[in-house]
Swiss-Prot record:
Function: May bind amino acids.
Name listed for the protein in its UniProt record: ACT domain-containing protein ACR10
Domain ACT residue range list: 22-105, 114-197, 245-324
Keyword check for Repeat: yes
Cited InterPro entries: ACR1-12, ACR2/9/10_N, ACT-like_dom_sf, ACT_ACR9/10_C, ACT_dom
PROSITE patterns: ACT (PS51671)
Source organism of the structure: Arabidopsis thaliana (Mouse-ear cress)
UniProt lineage: Eukaryota, Viridiplantae, Streptophyta, Embryophyta, Tracheophyta
Record bears the keyword Repeat: yes
CDD domains: ACT_ACR-like_4
Gene3D superfamilies: 3.30.70.260
Source species, domain of life: Eukaryota
Pfam family of the protein (one): ACT
Keywords annotated in UniProt: Repeat
Amino acid sequence: MGILSDDVVIISQSEKEGDPSVITINCPDKTGLGCDLCRILLFFGLNIVRGDVSTDGKWCYLVFWVIGKPNTRWNLLKMRLVEASPSFSWAFGISRCYLSDSESQPPKLPDLFLLKLACSDRTGLLYDVTEVLYKLEINIEKVKISTTPDGKVMDLFFVTDTRELLGTVKRRNEVYEYLRDAIGDSMISYDIELVGPEITACSTSSSVAETLFSSDVSGEHSSGLHTSSNVSIAVDNSLSSAHTLIHITCQDHKGLLYDIMRTFKDFNIQISYGRFTIKLGKNCEIDLFIVQSDGRKILDSSKLNALITRLRAELQQPLRVVMMNRGPDTELLVTNPVELSGKGRPQVFHDIALALKKIDTCIFSAEIGRHVTGDREWEVYKVLINEEDSLPIPRSKIEEEVWKTLMGWE
């Protein structure tokens, strides 16, 4: 049983460049739906300039005003938004024993593949590869990149396929053709093989962990880490008898709504009504009427304080960027929190590669892994800069360029 996709998601594309397109989503509700939808919008590179959300706990209505790009794939976007929306049966509380196997079973973990790519090195090579994988909806879970003394690059990408077709010859040939068009004669060899999920396990050294995870973002730029300024969060439990009101003012950044929705999803908080607007100067105002999973407002001060503390940290520092010395070399470190569901932030590695390409900075090696500290899991991106083949750029400039690109402040 389901709803016609044309009724679930309606996209009204803007007629004039620079004007927002309007995405309307009308579907059954579930905790974390807003996070899942905003994650998709972030993956497609859309900038949300306004948003309205309302739900009665069973059915929700969401409207996003977004600024797209000339190459935005609107039909594919609609397909992914429909897939993320709950089925019709969800809204009517149909028992799990009456659901189809596809609806009653927990989601199957996607197959993990190893993409091995050998190329001649050049500036911007990694960005070109990540851009191709992004266009093909192939998700990078982990990467190991190294450069040999004779100028060859071996890229090992551990990837999953959104379309779940990478096990087919046709899909692998498609990936090869796209990479060949982007890389050209620089490509030396190419191969894809199925691997086990345990291969993605990774640990981070204690010195790196201390730098990235122990800083207090409530103060100044501790440990040289960048933060977003002017974050204000107010709580009102008196305005509504049934809801807790969260009022947020802050500076806009790429994925702002995703960071807010992700936090609420991790805390199992439901949004009954919400409004998001961007004022002049890229300042945002957000009003959210929220309830706990039991449908009641949040009266427990300890729960409320924990939520606000986490929310403030996510808005001040959704990602952490720092340059470190690694012997005579320079290492760029970027990290971001992982959802409790295990999903990481979209397009981080793509944006790191883009930022380094813009300032003609070469990459000698790169790794993506995960690190657990306390009750949280983080994605960690480690990039060793090839300073010999790069322009003489101050390390602070590299750090700032990567931060601005990740935050969407180019």
